[in-house]
Structure formats: structure tokens, C-alpha cells
């Protein structure tokens, strides 16, 4: 038997918040702020957005490792946060997240039509998230009521390691019956999510305007004047540079054009690991 390069994409592996649902990725961000506040520790929205894309326990651990947040915690408790302290914050985070996830459950405008088109062109739709399964079950339920059902879902606690490790993306490959990782494209609005796709050997597409990096509602995004929007694009492109996404687009609605381009590159023999 001889190896043959795939000639077209077989699956898109999609993130959830900031990619398909919750324009601006507000659901997790605000809850981090509220969870820390219950321990009398102030964390700003901007600080909370920093590690977005990681599993939520790891996200809280990363926040607690930031010197300014660790110092605020020390002033309240007389010590810097231990792993047990992180777990305590996480345990408060979880019910808050489940309780309020519905507030930010709307599909990103145009996403459903875009994904319907991808499926009509033969693509399977996998998905993964930094949410644990108990939260993802609720997210999936709410999305289904709005018409979106992924072919497979992998939560961050269903693999040994979450992002930026490749395990969740690869779990989708196995479950969907894809025969080559190079026939997959990973779409995400965070650096850890793009690294996940890169490490899994997939094509990667970073979303610039619909997710955590821009951090605006759909209405806020649409209201930006052209100069401000272009400046924000440049800032966010620079933020993603180290993770080396193959493509950067504003929202998932530009994905069909990317799919067409990737298929042309695959047909020419190009592979995602080589670029």
C-alpha cells in the first residue's frame, strides 16, 4: 500500500463560542469575572479574555499565575493561589456558567446557512470546546433548538489534555471516520484552538472578528468605522501570528471561500504541515 495525499477536505472541526455561537464570546468571559468576585478578587474582562480557548480549570490557573491577580488574591487570603484554590474558584464557576449559558446562546448571524452549505458539499462537521461536558451538554441543547447540530462534539474533559494539545481535534477525526488529518480544517477564534489544529496536522482558520480577540457584540462589530475595524484586524492578526494559522477571516461566513482554496491546494499536492 502506498500513501496518497488527500485531494479534498472531508471535515471541518469547529469551535463553539465565538465561532458558531455567542458572537464576541461573552458567556465564559463574564462568568470568570463573577466567579473571582465571589472570592473578593477583582478580575477585569480584558484579563479574563487572555487565556481563552483553554479548558476552564487551566484558564483559571493561568489567570491565578498572572502576578497582578496573584497579588490581589494574596491581599485577601494571605497567600497566592494554590491548585486547591483554583479548584474552589472552578467549582464556583461551573454552576454560574451553566445557569447563564442561555443568555449568550444565539447562533452567529449567517452561521447556520454557511454550515448547511458546507454539508451540502460533503463536509462532516466536528466540534470541540474549552467547556467541560456538563456545560457543553447545555450549549449543544440550546444550539439544537436554533437549528445547529454538529456531527460530533468533544468537551475539554473528555480527553486527557485540552487545548492547545491536539487531543480534542483528533478525537473528532476518529469519531467522524476521517482517513487523513490533512483532510480536515480546524476553525477557531483563539490561539490555543489554532495551536490545537496545527498540532493535529490540520489546516487552520483563525476567526478575527466574531470571537474573543475583538470581544464585541455583533452590533458593536457592525458599528465600527472602517479605520477602527482595520486597526483591530491588524492587532488581532499580530496576536495570532505565533500560532501560524493558514487563514485569517472575519467570521465563519467567509469559510466557504477558504474551503474552496484549500481544496485547490490539496489537489495540487499541498499539505497543511508543509506551510
Curated annotation (Swiss-Prot):
Kindly indicate whether the keyword Metal-binding belongs to this entry.
Answer: yes
Q: What is the residue range of the signal peptide feature?
A: none
Keyword check for Metal-binding, yes or no.
yes
Molecular function GO terms recorded? magnesium ion binding; phosphoglycolate phosphatase activity; phosphonoacetaldehyde hydrolase activity
Which keywords fit this entry according to its UniProt record?
Hydrolase, Magnesium, Metal-binding, Schiff base
Active site (UniProt)? 15, 56
Q: What is its EC number?
A: 3.11.1.1
Give the top-rank taxon of the lineage listed in the UniProt record for this protein.
Answer: Bacteria
Q: Which Pfam families match?
A: Hydrolase (PF00702)
How is this protein annotated for GO cellular component? cytosol
Its needed co-factors are: Mg(2+)
The annotation note on the cofactor reads:
Binds 1 Mg(2+) ion per subunit.
- Name the chemical reaction catalysed here: phosphonoacetaldehyde + H2O = acetaldehyde + phosphate + H(+)
- SUPFAM superfamilies per the UniProt record, alphabetical: HAD-like (SSF56784)
Q: Where does Mg(2+) bind?
A: 15, 17, 189
Q: Which family does it belong to?
A: Belongs to the HAD-like hydrolase superfamily. PhnX family.
Reported function? Involved in phosphonate degradation.
Subunit organization: Homodimer.
Please give the name of this protein: Phosphonoacetaldehyde hydrolase
Q: Which organism is it from?
A: Pseudomonas putida
Lineage, broadest ranks:
Bacteria, Pseudomonadati, Pseudomonadota, Gammaproteobacteria, Pseudomonadales
